[in-house]
Amino acid sequence: AVSCFKACMKKRGIPFVCSVDC
């Protein structure tokens, strides 16, 4: 989950959106 979140952060940079995606 953490690695997914970090990867999403690099793509979008929006934490709450990353949480929904993951």
From Swiss-Prot:
Annotated localization: Secreted
Post-translational modification as stated in the protein's UniProt record: Contains 2 disulfide bonds.
Keywords associated with the record: Disulfide bond, Secreted
Tissues where the protein occurs: Expressed by the venom gland.
GO CC annotation: extracellular region
Disulfide bond found in the keyword field: yes
Signal peptide start and end residues: none
Chief location bin: secreted
Ranges in a coiled coil: none
Protein function: Not lethal to mice by intraperitoneal or intracerebroventricular injections in doses up to 100 micrograms.
Annotated protein name in UniProt: 2.39 kDa venom peptide
